[in-house]
């Protein structure tokens, strides 16, 4: 049953591919999501708001759909901190030129590792959110303030950041 759940549809080129069911009343599991999309592929093949990759030159990468919705049309979600090779390939082959990575604070090393996979081909900026806060907690205005205070990073800078996290 999806009673008490907010349903967030995932479209790809105008076609419904997947959905998130997020509990908003507190009873039952936090999420009630399907294991696969309508084509039978698992969530590692899904990007929320995938179409933004072809529409914008700068795109924000978040973990969850609600975080992406907080940022707006230019944000995508990867369905978690562990980003699949398929998702990385989609980011690399897109028309987008700049990525702003906004993963949750517990995923800092994942964010830097994603940036390292992209930086040879795209401009990347890893924005570290304050401990205990995701994009949704901070809101759009505070998140964008952090984004504007962070500059794009080079491969060497990302290596230094990764080493400092270990």
Where are these regions (language model features)?
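Phosphate-handling DNA/RNA-contact segment within nucleic-acid enzymes
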Residues: 1-97
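TOPRIM fold recognition
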Residues: 29, 56-59, 67-166
